Amino acid sequence: MEASATVERAAAKDVLTIREVLRETWHDTYASLLPETAIETITSQWHAPALLADQIQNPDIYFAIARDGGVVAGVVTARKEIDAIVVGRLYVRPHHQRRGIGRQLLESCYRAFRDAQKVRLTVEADNRKGVAFYTKQGFREVARSSEEIAGARLENVIMEKPL
């Protein structure tokens, strides 16, 4: 099913709803990959309302939401780094997935940084849905990395797509 969502820049009034979207999708995506305590620690730190509000206000960060039927269904953040768009986060609520909303959010990043030559992102290697989605969007693996977050070890795939 194709999306009927509208993508718009996030506003300060959206912070609590954005936090809810991020928490919901993090729990859905990572429940089988990370301990619950790690998910709670990460979501409380990375998705703190003050941090999200600062990112929304930062002119160097593209922060957008997708509304589907009036409901915030997805979130994307990106920034420009030399000739590349670096996607920091892209999450779509579980019951809104497979409708083209993720693609719409990605494409909005391309429009926000029209002079970029490529787009880069990092996805957890065991996040099969995420890796499959990005592969379908034309991304290819260019490197791997690992990191420890909240006591959990994550193996990451760094993916790029030429524009």
Residues covered by each model-derived region:
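Basic/polar N-terminal segments that are highly enriched at the extreme N-terminus
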Residues: 1-2
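Short, contiguous strand/loop micro-motifs
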Residues: 39, 117-118
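Residues forming the Rossmann-fold NAD(P)(H) cofactor-binding site
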Residues: 103
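Conserved G/P- and acidic residue-centered "switch" motifs that form tight phosphate/ATP-binding loops
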Residues: 100
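Acetyl-CoA-dependent GNAT
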Residues: 5, 9-13, 19-97, 106-112, ...
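C-terminal "cap" of GNAT-fold acetyltransferases
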Residues: 55, 118-131, 135-163
